[in-house]
Amino acid sequence: MKRLLAVPAVLTLALSLAACGDDEPSTGSDGADGVACTYNETGDAAREVDLPPGEATATDKVEVVITTTNGDLRATLNGDTTPCTVNSFLSLAEQGFYDDTPCPRITTTPGFEVLQCGDPSGTTAGGPGYQYEDELSGGETYPAGTLAMANSGPDTQGSQFFIVYGDTQLRPDYTVFGTVDEADLSVIEEIAQDGDDGTNPAGGGAPNTPIGLVSITTD
């Protein structure tokens, strides 16, 4: 399962994904119009989708609206610095992978404040049936508003992501692929005030006030 683990001084986010496989990847070629990306099939999709294109063409900033059951979150995706992550995220959004899915976990400890979404199974263990490499600089930080990918270890990104609604200390192991408008974080802050059920052994649990994704669309 994907999980957030607290360690002294620094928090490490290990958001688990289902077991991976080693099937045929989707790849592209570097070119003037895009960036080559490789997506490796794992055969364990929580909801069936096609692999993303093997070439990322969204290589600039992309505006999206993350519509939740509790309000809209306007976000800017970093296609310029994390093109393969943004390519996957947009592909999943366009295929309806995220539509009508729960956000199964929230953490409310000061310094560790995130909402985890992107698993149609609602277990924090599901994914899209493929994984791909991290896009890290080594200098990642996770202030409020950060939009980042969950993982279960190096290069295991899939569909699950987390939104940081309060400044959070994590090791720089999680691809930061966008930011959520500060004004919209109140949607999550209100949910956080009601706490969680404490069922996740690594911290946090299901929000006591449920929240889920309705859709993700380009703005």
Language model features by range: what are they?
Residues K2-D219:
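Cyclophilin-like peptidyl-prolyl cis-trans isomerases
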